[in-house]
């Protein structure tokens, strides 16, 4: 294997690539030494081939010298920005999964060193295959990356020299389950005999370099938080803390991957162009695995961060494991590489899962780990995910962003604490969650991976190809399946919790089409998974939970059943509630002293008539749109639908508050207790008295406000509640209609990869008289490695320009039939409820003879159920808050 060049301070390689080296003492214009060798290499650099993106190095604006002049001083950190203007970014931007041009394909081939015209004549080296079949090679990293490692780590007694000087590449030609030591595969932390306490995994599909850098840089800052702990007994014994942490990136296919993101990874040393092999002796490579320990990071604003001498805020070394799957095979397959391949070798105690684009907050990963450290029966946990609001919270001006921000906040204040109090959090979001590895081993992971289509042939009828459409939708929310299987694991008493101190920030959809498409997957998956957990609740009895825990799990199941029923009939409930309130206020009757409001006795009924039938007309439009159109193709229609239902909701809210105010001010409620408390309660809670409406309003909006204040997080009430309350109707009439009408839309296929075809193959040879196989590979000089690295850094630090994407959805006719049956059942059941309540012609089936009385009773049931569920959530939230406050005083730190 190649040997890296020495760390000579005067070596021409380091001098030419020294934009990682220490800055000059002059704060304005640094002075850099130049010698003849450097001048020759600069000349050679300019005479070399064009960069992979087609522009020449002759431009003085992009010379290597100019890179040194751009520094950004973050506290204790020096970073480097590209010297060219934003308009040049298009010249260095690689295409994403849609619409690769021939020029970009040619650039990708040049980056991988496929074209003979792009190759120089180098020396070669022989590389022996592990056990005669596994290709695992060490490649020297650029001198600039080597020199960025601080001497205190590089020269430490427990350090391994090659982990800082060489990147290790392994071509995995096997299934994740076969990635084992027995088959010749290994990972550096295991080779170095290091204990992995924390495995931090980032799953990626096609996110741009800004989103990826946001997550990766946030993770590295969190690793620094852990390493800098001074009083920790655990992290400060048995070796340096950074050696107990591994950061794993799993990219779901070469084809959808943003190539600029690969440049970011190459800039910090964990990836190199031209080393991947599409097959080894005809055996197709399934995953390309890179390993390197780095101290470099790239910020979301494309600033390069490196350590400074004697600065406590420096990033520590981070053990990076980068898995680039050759084909797109879905996120669940990425988790199979994480849990069944890498985790079996590293055997981590805790696995933290993040999605690319989720930025963990300060010390958030430490807070997640502490929850497991202080509770040995904790099997899984999640943190608080909140929406990214932009600078100055300007994103809350967008109603969709504001509504989602409020929804996230209320879920973290009411829903997650309630479920945590029971010990079973129904969903630990894959974007920001953690599991104890030994807790999910066995049946939980086995059931979880039934949704991996790459296992369909092996599993047969139990696999994804043998599932009906209901089960396939269930695996759209596969994280819910894993949560249930973990709690119900036979013989164990694992529970789940929510960690308030751990926070993660994520971007949310800002336009209606993206929002609808996202919620389709969430709603269908959660609905199917909720039914799964209810139908398989009996498996809880085989677990090792205590009697008290079992009792509360039963209470939670009853609560979940009530929520499911309320959700199923919510289409009718929203219509009936809106209609009843409009009739109570806008129709002259004895209940309102024959005074219709707000447009008078003549106009109010007419306005309400048009509002109600306009409501039904737009609702019918949603079924037409959902059954035959894509949200991106009918953006205007969906936007207008959102606006209409928001206006109706605003109108109904005004009528509701008027009804309550009029009940108190107009004498509709009898406050005379002389005739007994029963008479007062009867008057207060009658369907026409306004008291029950007051209870429903207070139990909903009032609880939101009180709980937010108790959690000392009330700002979303001021900034985002308006959008959420106005958009409550849209969540049912638009999102659920679209989700159920597209129940059949489940695609699990693997796409081919032209980018994988562009990779070179590895063919083995046998030496005379030797039984071992080897491959012969080009041995590039360090100077050429550094030269190519210059181009990589320029691409990585180029200003980001968002590309335009156009995606299509392929549907299967057999799934449409099930979809139609489900939608018909949903519509008919809600229509039946509406007819039973409002139709005067149906008398023999009901206890009362008038629709008015039935409407009053139904109105009371809906409002009381809403109030009861809200109060139940509030009680659970208060319990969690008190428990957290007590545990905060007694837990180990």
Swiss-Prot record:
It holds the Pfam family Chitin_synth_1. One of its GO terms (cellular component) is cell periphery. GO terms for molecular function: chitin synthase activity. The keyword Ubl conjugation does not apply. The chain crosses the membrane at residues 565-585, 606-626, 640-660, 690-710, 721-741, 822-842, 861-881. Residues 21-31 have a biased composition (Low complexity). CDD domains: Chitin_synth_C. It is a multi-pass membrane protein. It catalyses: [(1->4)-N-acetyl-beta-D-glucosaminyl](n) + UDP-N-acetyl-alpha-D-glucosamine = [(1->4)-N-acetyl-beta-D-glucosaminyl](n+1) + UDP + H(+). Its EC number is 2.4.1.16. Keywords: Cell membrane, Cell wall biogenesis/degradation, Glycosyltransferase, Membrane, Transferase, Transmembrane, Transmembrane helix. It is an enzyme of class 2 (transferase). One of its GO terms (biological process) is cell wall organization. Polymerizes chitin, a structural polymer of the cell wall and septum, by transferring the sugar moiety of UDP-GlcNAc to the non-reducing end of the growing chitin polymer. Belongs to the chitin synthase family. Class III subfamily. This is Chitin synthase C.
